[in-house]
Regions:
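A short, N-terminal "cap"/entry segment at the start of jelly-roll beta-barrel domains
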Residues: 1-40, 45, 124-128
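Conserved short histidine dyad/triad with adjacent acidic residue
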Residues: 27-30, 44-58, 93
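Short, conserved beta-strand element in jelly-roll/cupin
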Residues: 47-49, 58-74
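Structural motif
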Residues: 71-73, 80, 96, 106
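Ligand-binding loop in jelly-roll beta-barrel domains
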Residues: 93-119
Length: 128
């Protein structure tokens, strides 16, 4: 993961296509992609392969996912729904959820998350 501040100088432009790809949530999810952390926000370009995704988990901080390609099937707050291309998913803090790429194809999305917990040394993803 890249950092927004490098040797005291801010980096202003990030090229996701040339950044290192890695597993983004460890064993909690099949998500892979590139990410960086700014002073207060985590951002990533994430891909979930067709029919794969996350186990039930939550983040102590607020999260937004904007779907660029494909669709995500989400279970959250006792509801199941699909988030299609061009739509934004809001995940409130501490909300248990799963997100899986639909069987129709891979899903690619941008994720933004507050990093208050990370700065406090707390886990940023908690599997349930």
């Amino acid at each position: 993961m890249a950092s927004a501040e490098q040797a005291g100088n801010w980096q202003y432009v990030y090229d996701f296509q040339n950044m290192k790809k890695e597993a983004l949530l460890g064993k909690t999810s099949t998500s892979e992609g590139s990410s960086f952390t700014g002073e207060r926000i985590y951002c990533g370009l994430v891909t979930k392969r067709r029919g794969t995704g996350s186990k039930p988990h939550y983040h102590p901080d607020e999260t937004f996912n904007y779907v660029l390609k494909g669709a995500l099937k989400v279970n959250m707050d006792g509801q199941e729904f699909v988030v299609p291309t061009g739509c934004l998913l809001h995940i409130p803090p501490n909300m248990v959820h799963t997100a899986v790429a639909t069987d129709e194809g891979d899903a690619t999305y941008l994720v933004w998350r507050d990093i208050v917990s990370e700065k406090e040394g707390k886990p940023t993803t908690v599997e349930v």
